[in-house]
A protein has these predicted regions:
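Conserved GNAT-fold acetyl-CoA-binding loop/helix
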Residues: 1-22
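A short helix-loop-beta-strand connector motif used in the catalytic cores of GNAT acetyltransferases and
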Residues: 21-31, 62, 136
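Conserved acetyl-CoA-binding loop-helix of GNAT-fold acetyltransferases
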Residues: 68, 74-87, 110-114
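C-terminal "cap" of GNAT-fold acetyltransferases
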Residues: 102-104, 115, 125-148
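Conserved acetyl-CoA binding element of GNAT-fold acetyltransferases
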Residues: 53-70
Length: 148
């Protein structure tokens, strides 16, 4: 997050470390590793009702907190995440892969669209205690890809 902030990319003001620990314990946090080096980390959810609202129908895997090690940027780490998510979704009879990102970062939105994600809408997340602190009151772009 620090490096992204230094490069003028928007970053979270804070992060819910207890939530991260819970995701790890619940096997919802993943990493791509090569030779003991972490190349990329990401988390998944199977429900995201506060952000996806009426579209959240138990038919999707939601990708969150995708972070690529800066030393491995530009080496298709996201493609590895997406390929894994597509296989997982298909083998679990899920129809979509969904994610959200900063609404005002057209560069990252276009990047995800280049992989086939469709822009659904911009949305301001609620200030709900059920959301992790870093996900409250954000303007996000909602993206999804059909994997059927």
């Amino acid at each position: 997050m620090k490096l992204q902030g230094q490069k003028n990319y928007k970053v979270w003001d804070s992060i819910d470390f207890d939530g991260l620990k819970k995701d790890i314990l619940n096997n919802l946090q993943y990493k791509i590793v090569r030779d003991d080096t972490i190349l990329c980390i990401f988390s998944v959810q199977f429900s995201d009702p506060y952000i996806w609202r009426d579209r959240d129908r138990n038919d999707a895997i939601y990708l969150h907190r995708i972070v690529v090690n800066p030393l491995y940027k530009g080496q298709n780490q996201f493609l590895k995440v997406l390929t894994w998510a597509q296989k997982f979704a298909r083998s679990n009879n899920l129809d979509f892969i969904r994610m959200d990102t900063w609404a005002d970062n057209q560069k990252i939105i276009n990047y995800y669209r280049s992989f086939g994600f469709q822009f659904i809408e911009n949305f301001k997340t609620p200030n709900a205690a059920e959301l992790p602190i870093q996900n409250r009151n954000l303007n996000v772009a909602l993206l999804e890809i059909d994997v059927k």
